[in-house]
């Protein structure tokens, strides 16, 4: 026969671990909060951090500052990289100067393919955007996402 104290400890341990697990699962998939600041600022946002393999990913590039930002192409400097820094996706875009006004945002949808059209595998990836360096204010922002099976 199992002592009452052991049963109480086991039940409380199982219940407590469920509560803690649910808490961490909720905060792990929270989207970051956008904060607007004075001066130049660039933000990248997705609706969540964890995505299923093959799920379209909406990427927002936002001017979260008070001055216009200049980009060297129509894709607003968007690149998808592996964590080791190798770029494997960059949208096809015209090489024209693009300007993002304060509080303006541009949305791109990435269908989890590489630039050569092949599908990616599950893993961690970095979404990066950077402004044109000729304007004097070189800004680069990145976020990390997880692709799960």
Predicted feature descriptions by range:
Residues 105, 119-131:
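A short tyrosine-centered beta-strand micro-motif
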Residues 1-2:
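N-terminal Lys/Arg-rich, disordered targeting/topogenic segments
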Residues 5-87, 91-92, 100, 130-149:
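Primarily secretory-pathway and cell-envelope proteins
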Residues 90-115:
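Intrinsically disordered, low-complexity Pro/Gly/Ser/Thr-rich segments with frequent PxxP/GP/PP motifs
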């Amino acid at each position: 026969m199992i002592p009452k104290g052991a049963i109480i400890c086991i039940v409380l341990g199982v219940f407590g671990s469920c509560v803690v697990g649910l808490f961490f699962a909720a905060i792990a998939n929270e989207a970051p909060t956008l904060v607007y600041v004075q001066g130049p600022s660039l933000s990248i946002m997705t609706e969540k951090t964890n995505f299923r393999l093959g799920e379209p990913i909406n990427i927002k590039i936002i001017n979260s500052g008070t001055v216009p930002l200049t980009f060297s192409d129509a894709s607003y400097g968007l690149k998808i990289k592996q964590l080791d820094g190798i770029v494997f996706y960059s949208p096809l875009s015209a090489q024209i100067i693009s300007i993002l006004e304060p509080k303006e945002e541009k949305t791109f949808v990435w269908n989890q393919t590489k630039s050569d059209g092949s599908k990616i595998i599950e893993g961690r990836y970095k979404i990066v955007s950077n402004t044109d360096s000729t304007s004097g204010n070189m800004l680069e922002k990145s976020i990390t996402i997880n692709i799960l099976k």
